[in-house]
Amino acid sequence: MTSITFISDTHNQASSLRLEPGDILCHTGDMTNFGTGPELKYFEDWFASQTQFKHKICIAGNHDKGLDYRNGKTPFKFTDSSITYLCDQAVELEGIKFYGTPWVNEYGPWAFGLHSYELYYRFGLIPDNTQVLLTHTPPKKILDYCPEQDIYIGSEELLDVVKLRPNLVCHAFGHCHEHSGRYLGAHDITFINSSNGNTQTIFL
């Protein structure tokens, strides 16, 4: 079996994590606080140093502004060959089909925010053969409750798409710091929120 370890929302604190060896390490966004070049380079160096994993995948989150190609500046590029960065892209590793997408509901001056109709388009690109889905936002009402504001911050558009993907086994995300953990949902999909250093591992 293949082990897949998930982390998210490390916000420049990734070096505080002590990760057990495994096959694939996935980071589901908000690697930084503001997405500056130095912050992203710091994360790249740390991520590349996790040589106890055979493969490493990451996607951006709303704090990772330097990766948003729409901001009028040349986006940061991960140059370390051991890192696979996904932005509306798929990759197959150890025979498992991954897809990564960073988009979130638009709010404030943050990165990768889209209106509802745009989210339906972006999430509609998720291939039917995807087995492990990496997003930054949770789907609506799945590990996305923020008690201070008494709201669910997940994406209804994402939920509508996820439940139509017939081969999906695991959906990992972050974004909501207050509700990390895992949940076995409909169609035996394992949903994982690994924000705030709450490392989660599955075996496929």
Regions found by a protein language model. Name each.
Residues 2-11, 26-28, 95-104, 131-136, ...:
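Active-site-proximal beta-strand elements of phosphoester/diester hydrolases
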Residues 7-93, 164:
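Core catalytic region of metal-dependent phosphoesterases/phosphodiesterases
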Residues 11, 17-19, 110-129, 135, ...:
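Active-site-proximal loop/helix segments of hydrolase catalytic cores
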Residues 11, 32, 62-64, 102-104, ...:
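Catalytic metal-binding/acid-base residues of hydrolase active sites
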Residues 32, 107, 129-167:
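Active-site-proximal segments of metal-dependent phosphoesterases and phosphodiesterases across multiple
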Residues 40-44, 74-76, 115-120, 148-159:
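Charged helix-capping and loop-helix junction motifs
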Residues 77-121:
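Hydrophobic, well-structured mid-protein blocks that either form specific transmembrane helices
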Residues 90-94, 157-165, 170, 177-204:
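Binuclear metal-dependent phosphoesterase catalytic core
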